[in-house]
Amino acid sequence: MHNGFDALQLHANRLRGVTIPDLLAAELKRPEQYARQVGPLYFNFARQKYDCVALEALFALARNHNVTGAFQRMFCGEQVNVTEGRAVLHTALRGDLSGTSVAVAAYTAAAKVRERMYALIAGLDASEVTDIVSVGIGGSDLGPRLVVDALRPISQGRFRVHFVSNVDGAAMRRTLDMLDPSRTAGILISKTFGTQETLLNGRILYDWLGGSERLYAVSANPERAVHAFDIVPTQVLPIWDWVGGRYSLWSAVGFPIALAIGSQRFEELLAGAAEFDAYALRVPLEENVAVLHGLTAVWNRNFLGCATYAVMAYDQRLALLPAYLQQLVMESLGKRVKCDGTPVDRDTVPVWWGGVGTDVQHSFFQALHQGTNIVPADFIGTIRNDDLYTENHFALNANLLAQIEVLANGQLSDDPHRVYPGGNPSTLILLDALTPQALGGLIAMYEHSVYVQSVIWGINAFDQFGVELGKHLAVQLLPALKGESVEVVDPVTRAVLVRLRG
């Protein structure tokens, strides 16, 4: 059989007419047997549409693709980013698990940069600066933005951090209009310092601040940062080519995080991720949540034919998590060729999307409950929320449980307009509380789940060539928008340029 895929297709065929309530009735201990606890994180896969026999076939698929060996190669610093010839060592930013010289060197370098970062924070602490504007896009923005927003209520930092990513000048204007330049510092985050959005927004910020005295940078190309904005070299923090943007919040890209929540909280975030790293590397496949989550995604995509995947965050502080995961998953797994350059032989990443509960119940949940598509989902909530509004938290979690149940089980009615077909599989993830440790572990789990999926599909999760062509074309079209004579081949673009130029 084809590396276990054929056997799994037989199981999918066998389970086609089986409902999720049928599975719960057939396996009475399913709610406990399909649950895992990893530190402050609880996972329950009982409402996924597989049984124990199909699940064993999924684990066989993981063994056939040597997922365990793939984890070891990544943690040890082998060049698992084969298309760019690079190691992938974001795990070394938060811990040293493999003991190899490459990983140890990476961990040591990251620790030294954090010391420099904390020294810069101490300097800002002693100044009159109250606000920080962080300029970046993609991986240089989404991760820090998520963490700062999620952990703001328990922040130990004294700085208000404002994020600007879009090249649309309205975003920068809206931010700067509410700040005092004499009490503001800026951080420019760009791996290459060639990103159009960051350079343009950085120039606006430079001019608004009146120079580079309170301007900082994070880059794998520090010389370019110094040259482009005349930033003092000691105010530039390095990152490395073995850290991809969407995996970089653990590095100096997390500078805005540490400023916003405090150095101690940032270390707790790293520790939570490191704890999950140790778990992912050492726990056997059959008990490993990251492996099970990744295999479940493969099952829903390739064997149940689900083309989208939803993330529902039932905690307002995690409102940015769906957007963060959208980038992490779709930029990593949105590939059509394998590592060896041959076409993939099955579908890869579904479209990831989602929102925050209970708002989503009043927007797209109608389509989930009574539409024509089956949409698997992750529901993410918190057990304890130490705020003043406990009654609201009870109501929030009541809605969380109710929606999962109805989406899975459905409900019959004599009125066809009131039938809930059910059949939507979901995974429930609960954080004991939204702490830096728990958030770090949650993000690390998703990183490792993505890697599992990439190994099964034989694709490289760590490049993103698909984003390049559009950026290059935009640079070529920019002079045409300014009225310069530029050859434009595409007839529609040529016609629209006339309209845009007025």
Curated annotation (Swiss-Prot):
Pfam families of this UniProt entry?
Answer: PGI (PF00342)
Q: Give the record's pathway.
A: Carbohydrate biosynthesis; gluconeogenesis; Carbohydrate degradation; glycolysis; D-glyceraldehyde 3-phosphate and glycerone phosphate from D-glucose: step 2/4
* Assigned keywords, A-Z: Cytoplasm, Gluconeogenesis, Glycolysis, Isomerase
**Which subcellular locations apply to this protein?**
Cytoplasm
- A GO molecular-function annotation: monosaccharide binding
Reported EC number(s) for this entry are 5.3.1.9
Its BP terms in the Gene Ontology are: gluconeogenesis; glucose 6-phosphate metabolic process; glycolytic process
Q: Which PROSITE patterns match?
A: P_GLUCOSE_ISOMERASE_1, P_GLUCOSE_ISOMERASE_2, P_GLUCOSE_ISOMERASE_3
GO terms for cellular component: cytosol
Cite the active-site annotation.
Answer: 331 (proton donor), 362, 471
Q: Which Gene3D superfamilies match?
A: 1.10.1390.10, Glucose-6-phosphate isomerase like protein, domain 1
Q: Please list the reactions this protein catalyses.
A: alpha-D-glucose 6-phosphate = beta-D-fructose 6-phosphate
The record's section on InterPro entries has: G6P_Isomerase (IPR001672), G6P_Isomerase_C (IPR023096), Phosphoglucose_isomerase_CS (IPR018189), SIS_dom_sf (IPR046348), SIS_PGI_1 (IPR035476), SIS_PGI_2 (IPR035482)
PANTHER family with a match to the protein in the record? GLUCOSE-6-PHOSPHATE ISOMERASE
The record's similarity note reads:
Belongs to the GPI family.
This protein's name: Glucose-6-phosphate isomerase
